[in-house]
């Protein structure tokens, strides 16, 4: 789950079997948070503040009955849309969850659709290996649990998920054992 897109792929024997890229990413979540804070609290916030809210309050399986007291409010600063003056407001976790729930539904639906298009011969490998989540927004609380619940598959998360793609590219480029995974566009003769 990258900044602007989410890539869902089934990989086997070092190659992509089926793949889908959807235009949903962390930046879209940030914008959804900006929009709901403006709509519900009459406060304009910037994308950095929205990202802070995302990292602190976002939960793919939010259950307000199971939350500790005080964990469900984050105080943020912005500009009041009515007065135009700086303002502080407590943003609730349940408001953020309701605003971004559709994002997670779209991701899980896309994963299930891709798995339905996957050759049945790969089912054993998929069940054994599971799903791997990478990218900055893949570390949102309970996203792995939601995907596991929706797909009935094991979901693996990676350490430092936001840097995993660039670290992988670095390994592919620097280690000759992985050269076959590198894509090099052919020069055109224009």
Residue map of PLM features:
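Phosphate-binding glycine-rich/basic clefts of nucleotide- and phosphate-handling proteins
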Residues: 11-101
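Phosphate/ATP-binding catalytic cores across multiple sugar-kinase/actin-like superfamilies
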Residues: 99-126, 172-175
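Short, surface-exposed connector motifs at secondary-structure boundaries
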Residues: 13-17, 124-129, 151-154
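Residue-level signature of catalytic and energy-coupling elements of molecular machines
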Residues: 33, 111, 133, 169
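Glycine-rich phosphate-binding/hydrolytic loop that grips phosphoryl groups
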Residues: 145, 156-190
